[in-house]
């Protein structure tokens, strides 16, 4: 870290792009050199009412399953209006997602985070089948593409609000787009403030609002 700190403060360095842990990002911001930093983050994706739902789900699942979810910019959670939840779940299941029941959600939630609240490295880049076996989930069908867990809160005690570098998604709902926007902001400020947000919509007014 000392060598990295010296490099960031060097007079020939004009700009720093810091990615990785929060300590690295803090060091970049305090170096005195202009810096753009991104630490861990739970990037949410909003499936707005006007979206092409099959296409939006395909894009999210393709993104989240690429390299078994190791890309930090891939979706970490999805969110939709409450009255769309059934349709979203049905389409996700049609395309290979497996929604955990309450007991499975609790079991996997205890596995994906360590006691200190950090991500369990055993999930990183692992397949759904491997994660299911490691976590003791014996009802996940062979060939499931992602594991999806319903989540309501953000922060400690809500493991699916954390970054998950594996084929695991949190699933949130909001009363309407205003409620969704508030939850999205809460998610984004929990880890890696302002990390990544995406929205699937065909309504330009929704784009402007967010």
Residue ranges, per PLM feature:
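Short acidic loop-to-helix transition motifs that present clustered carboxylates
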Residues: 1-3, 23-24, 203-204
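A structured beta-alpha segment of the ubiquitous adenosine-cofactor-binding alpha/beta core
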Residues: 1-13
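Short hydrophobic/charged patches on amphipathic alpha-helices used for structural packing
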Residues: 4-5, 57, 181
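Hydrophobic/aromatic ligand-binding patch that stacks against planar heteroaromatic rings
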Residues: 7, 27, 210
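Short glycine-enriched loop/turn motifs at secondary-structure junctions
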Residues: 10, 38-40, 70-74, 162-167, ...
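Glycine-rich phosphate-binding loop
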Residues: 16-28
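ALDH superfamily catalytic-core signature
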Residues: 25-155
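Conserved C-terminal structural/oligomerization subdomain of aldehyde/semialdehyde dehydrogenase
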Residues: 138-210
């Amino acid at each position: 870290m000392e060598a990295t700190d010296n490099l960031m403060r060097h007079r020939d360095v004009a700009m720093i792009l810091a990615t990785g842990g929060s300590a690295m990002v803090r060091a970049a911001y305090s170096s005195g050199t202009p810096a753009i930093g991104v630490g861990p983050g739970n990037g949410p994706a909003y499936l707005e009412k006007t979206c092409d739902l099959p296409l939006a789900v395909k894009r999210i699942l393709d993104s989240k399953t690429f390299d078994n979810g190791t890309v930090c910019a891939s979706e970490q959670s999805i969110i939709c209006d409450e009255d769309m939840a059934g349709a979203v779940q049905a389409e996700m299941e049609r395309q290979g997602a497996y929604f955990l029941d309450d007991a499975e959600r609790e079991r996997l939630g205890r596995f994906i985070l360590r006691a200190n609240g950090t991500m369990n490295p055993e999930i990183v880049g692992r397949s759904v089948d491997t994660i299911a076996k490691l976590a003791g989930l014996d009802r996940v069908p062979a060939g499931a593409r992602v594991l999806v867990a319903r989540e309501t809160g953000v922060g400690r005690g809500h493991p699916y609000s954390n970054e998950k570098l594996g084929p695991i998604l949190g699933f949130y709902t909001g009363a309407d787009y205003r409620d969704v926007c508030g939850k999205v902001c809460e998610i984004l400020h929990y880890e890696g403030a302002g990390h990544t947000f995406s929205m699937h919509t065909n309504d330009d007014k929704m784009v402007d609002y967010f």
